[in-house]
């Protein structure tokens, strides 16, 4: 009976892990839109914190033509993405030093 109970518990844990992985993937692929200045600036970002698009209303940059405005939008998106990647790298380095002495199972990431 004890072995059967343990096997059932292990199976439930595996199912939960699979569901969590699926949910994490769905969240990572989700897109959200942030707006500021009465919708003059719009940012589309994924759940992975990747900026996909920045849109700046032409009235915000009145001296620029459409091509130049698009360049500014792309540069803002690239700068935000670079900052996010730096934060991720810093977090991994800090967590790595914190968990260096722990014998964590392969593939286990902190924080959960």
From Swiss-Prot:
Gene3D superfamilies (UniProt xref): Nucleoid-associated protein YbaB-like domain
Alphabetically ordered keywords of this record: Cytoplasm, DNA-binding
Job description of the protein: Binds to DNA and alters its conformation. May be involved in regulation of gene expression, nucleoid organization and DNA protection.
Location relative to the cell: Cytoplasm, Nucleoid
Chief localization: cytoplasm
Keyword ATP-binding: no
HAMAP family the record matches: DNA_YbaB_EbfC
Pfam families linked to this entry: YbaB_DNA_bd
Oligomer and partners: Homodimer.
Molecular-function GO terms, alphabetical: DNA binding
UniProt similarity note: Belongs to the YbaB/EbfC family.
Taxonomic source organism: Pseudomonas fluorescens (strain Pf0-1)
GO terms for cellular component: bacterial nucleoid; cytosol
Protein name: Nucleoid-associated protein Pfl01_1806
Biological classification of the source: Bacteria, Pseudomonadati, Pseudomonadota, Gammaproteobacteria, Pseudomonadales
Keyword check for Methyltransferase: no
């Amino acid at each position: 009976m004890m072995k059967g109970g343990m096997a059932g518990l292990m199976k439930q844990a595996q199912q939960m892990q699979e569901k969590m992985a699926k949910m994490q993937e769905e969240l990572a692929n989700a897109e959200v839109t942030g707006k500021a200045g009465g919708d003059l600036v719009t940012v589309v970002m994924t759940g992975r914190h990747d900026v996909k698009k920045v849109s700046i209303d032409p009235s915000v940059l009145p001296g620029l033509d459409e091509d130049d405005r698009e360049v500014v939008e792309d540069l803002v998106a690239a700068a935000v993405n670079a900052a996010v990647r730096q934060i991720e790298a810093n977090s991994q380095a800090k967590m790595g030093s914190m968990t260096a002495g722990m014998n964590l199972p392969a593939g286990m990431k902190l924080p959960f």
